[in-house]
Design a protein with these regions (language model features):
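Membrane-embedded architecture of ER/inner-membrane glycosylation machinery
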Residues: 2-4, 182, 186, 299-568
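Membrane-integral, polyisoprenol-dependent glycosyltransferases
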Residues: 1-371, 439, 465, 549-557
Length: 568
């Protein structure tokens, strides 16, 4: 009976099973990990400042305008702080993970409605465990939320397009069409309101390119006409008025011109060459790179003619849906490559369409021998990596060049890491076995993805020991109350006010400037210094000053000591 129930659950709710499994595997990491200094702490600090100052549309980071991002995600961060009373990694991670699940659900509904449960589970696992998609689903960024709205917009357009295939929609179809005609601009605006111009551009450009390819240029105005742009413009007007009232003309100018035109044309940050994404995408969709690039090539391969009839073979005729996916991928890739500012995470809106193009191409052309190799190669690499890791972790072989690394990170030999290595090895060996014996693609893909999630789940057991190496929460707990706080030789420490509850002074790597401040007796307030042991080793004078002032607390590679000042 339990076996039947299990089978029925997987058959009737394949996506729910994948979502539940993914959530369980990622839950320990979401519960225990620290915030990263580069972006996550900055969003928290901005939200704290907005709450303190009562800002709604204009945001500031330590008093400086922060017009880099629209307000929607920062509202979420602020509301979570107000609701829970503190910043929670778990609560904020949910706003990345749930949009990821919504995207998978939409793509499954769009493409896999007639597929088997095993194929649906494999495709869901493939998208979820693609490197960049998985990373974006657990980090605290607005990219996954924007991607969800982009997919919703394009899915809504597709419904409208299907309803018009046989002419003007009538009856219930007309009601659905009218609803979609309102939803389309709302989804586009929400994508814009989440991340910025990319959210505004991807859906309309993709729609326009698709209709041009289908030789229906006049239909562009049907979907992207006055109504669509009027709704978007009206919502933007409300937003911009709020920005003007909250931040003034200078903030509005910063939002509309410096952050938009500046990043697109002559980026002041993240500037990369035109070909950057052609390389980045190869690792962003790993471990399914060979499979997905292969299906992309298969999909765009020139049409073949029937030698006898002189006509185009049936397998060469792409469906409108497949053509739309290709247009989304191509137009988004070219558009993003033309922008000056580039980061791998900006590619996230393409990934659902790259992944779910695979079943359409395979169903049309057949699953050929290359697909088995495309799955088997990464599975074999993971299995080999897992075997080597097990041999090292269990002491079977000794790698002398890594001895210094093991001493610095002793938790690498903890049981959770060993279990993670075993799970990675076992999962991919099973994937290879099923690939050879059953000669199917779905189960091996599911096993490769599952092994990655189980590896993350097991390795999360050492997060408490890993946190001090990539976050500042633990070292900030050692900072005493009532002192000025200074930092030296730290990476992006400006937002640790989230932890210490007061503004800090960052000296970068300028040890001389800090020593001068420390010797100034005009300010008698004690000063706590957060720095690294490496910095102390390289600067004996600083080390002597800190250790002579009292006890020095250490957490991971960081240390904190308090310097007492006295008037002469």
């Amino acid at each position: 009976m339990p076996s039947n129930l299990k089978t029925n659950f997987l058959t009737r709710h394949p996506l729910m099973a994948v979502f539940l499994f993914t959530f369980i595997c990622l839950l320990p990491a979401m519960l225990m990990r620290d915030f990263t200094p580069s972006n996550e702490l900055r969003y928290l600090s901005i939200a704290d400042e907005a709450i303190a100052n009562g800002n709604i549309f204009a945001f500031y980071n330590h008093g400086l305008p922060y017009a880099d991002k629209p307000p929607l995600y920062l509202w979420i961060v602020a509301l979570c702080k107000l609701f829970f009373g503190q910043h929670s990694v778990l609560a904020l991670s949910i706003f990345s993970l749930i949009p990821a699940f919504v995207i998978v659900w939409l793509m499954d509904k769009w493409v896999m409605s007639d597929a088997s449960s095993s194929d649906r589970m494999a495709m869901a696992m493939m998208l979820i465990t693609s490197v960049m998609f998985l990373g974006t689903a657990v980090v605290l960024r607005m990219d996954m939320l924007m991607c969800m709205f982009i997919v919703l917009a394009l899915f809504t357009f597709w419904r409208m397009y299907e309803l018009r295939l046989d002419g003007e929609p009538e009856g219930e179809d007309a009601v659905v069409y009218r609803k979609c005609s309102w939803l389309l601009p709302i989804w586009i605006f929400l994508a814009l309101f989440t991340k910025g111009p990319v959210g505004l551009l991807v859906p309309p450009v993709s729609i326009a390119v698709f209709l041009l390819v289908k030789r229906k240029p006049r239909d562009i105005a049907r979907y992207l006409g006055w109504k669509t742009w009027g709704v978007i413009a009206g919502l933007c007007a409300v937003w911009f008025i709020g920005v003007f009232l909250d931040g003034g003309v200078s903030y509005l100018d910063n939002l509309l011109f410096k952050q938009t035109v500046g990043r697109a044309v002559n980026a002041f940050t993240h500037s990369k060459p035109f070909w950057f994404y052609a390389v980045a995408i190869l690792w962003c969709i790993a471990p399914y790179t060979l499979l997905l690039i292969g299906s992309l090539i298969l999909s765009v391969w020139p049409r073949r003619k029937n030698a006898e009839a002189g006509s185009i073979s049936a397998e060469a005729v792409k469906s409108d849906k497949e053509m739309l996916f290709l247009c989304v991928i191509a137009s988004t890739f070219v558009m993003l490559s033309s922008f000056s500012s580039k980061l791998p995470v900006y590619l996230v809106p393409m990934f659902p369409f790259i992944v779910y193009l695979f079943p359409m191409a395979v169903n049309r052309c057949g699953c050929r021998r290359w697909a088995a190799w495309a799955i088997g190669v990464p599975a074999a690499i993971f299995a080999l990596v897992g075997i080597v890791a097990c041999l090292v972790l269990f002491g079977v072989i000794n790698v002398e060049p890594l001895d210094a690394t093991w001493k610095e990170y002793p938790f690498a030999f903890d049981p959770p890491i060993k279990i993670a290595a075993v799970l990675l090895t076992a999962g991919n060996l099973l994937a290879l076995w099923f690939l050879v014996r059953r000669k199917v693609w779905n189960l091996p893909v599911f096993l490769v993805g599952s092994s990655l999630l189980l590896t993350v789940y097991a390795a999360s057991g050492v997060l408490a020991k890993v946190n001090p190496y990539f976050g500042y929460r633990e070292i900030c707990k050692e900072v005493p109350m009532g002192t000025d706080v200074a930092t030296l030789c730290l990476h992006r420490p400006e937002n640790i006010d989230v932890y210490v509850g007061r503004q800090i002074k960052d000296y970068g790597k300028d040890v001389e400037a800090f020593m001068k401040t420390a010797s100034d007796t005009t300010n008698t307030r004690p000063m706590s210094l957060i720095t690294t042991y490496k910095c102390l080793e390289e600067n004996p004078q600083l080390r002597d000053l800190l250790y002579s002032s009292g006890p020095v607390a250490s957490v991971g590679p960081y240390c904190v000591g308090t310097i007492e000042k006295h008037k002469k």
